[in-house]
């Protein structure tokens, strides 16, 4: 199902004029070529040999000023003119991550410079532990459509937007909140009319945290431990709603 969803995403975005460098997670996409690493093609699957030839794992984890190409792709998508945050406040994160098929993916995020070093360290610790993260693409790949990227189980950080089902800005709008493995760790809230708002809408089954399934975040999970030890709070502990994918900086 997730592979089908990704094919649909790719088709939609190609029709929208957004070029996906190579975001397929199949083994056919695996390569020992250094080009994907040199060009930092997020979503590409690479071999350990390619990583070694590129310069090693250390070279693949870094925080840098937003590159021109990334900044251009963010315009009108994750970034909109606003009084709260600008380009100089943000950093582009390069990282590697493992999936459940034991393959290495190239990943990237944009975050606030305040959390950049901490986020790089956490992602490196997750990589070293072979913690599975299915996708780590910029939300701009999905035209900053939060529902679409969450259905695709994408992990991300910065997006200038409001809180789901609310009118105030999300911590994602400042780049100080990170969502991990979003399909399996949904957001849900009981609305004033008694109805249940779930995001992504396809994740209703994963609101039940009493059963085990891949990518599940709970108090025993390494992702929870690393983020909370680094000064983040987990949305799964909130009382008025639950946001199991969400870690935000405690201010």
Residue ranges and their predicted role:
Residues 85-150:
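Active-site acidic/histidine clusters and adjacent loop/turn architecture
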Residues 20-22:
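C-terminal motif of bacterial Sec signal peptides marking the signal peptidase cleavage site
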Residues 9-18:
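Bacterial N-terminal signal peptides
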Residues 29-103:
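N-terminal module-boundary/linker segments of secreted carbohydrate-active enzymes
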